[in-house]
């Protein structure tokens, strides 16, 4: 099963305080592979971004040596001004769960 963390959620807002974009960052690995995983970004249940968790994260490589160091993700996604909740999900490989939620954050 994939696992990991949603470490950062930064909301950029318009002059009237509505969200316009969100930066998400964190990491994810799956014990069934050393390859980077795909990360889905959903807002109010709708897919708004699909990124690879392939950025350098030496801390993850040291903590989980079997995984290697390149399992970070960092992306900015556009969101609708009426957006409420952002969730990040990792896609797994091999046996186990195909998707695991890494975290959610209210962005309204």
PLM-predicted stretches and their roles:
Residues 1-108:
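Basic, ligand-binding patches in group-transfer machinery
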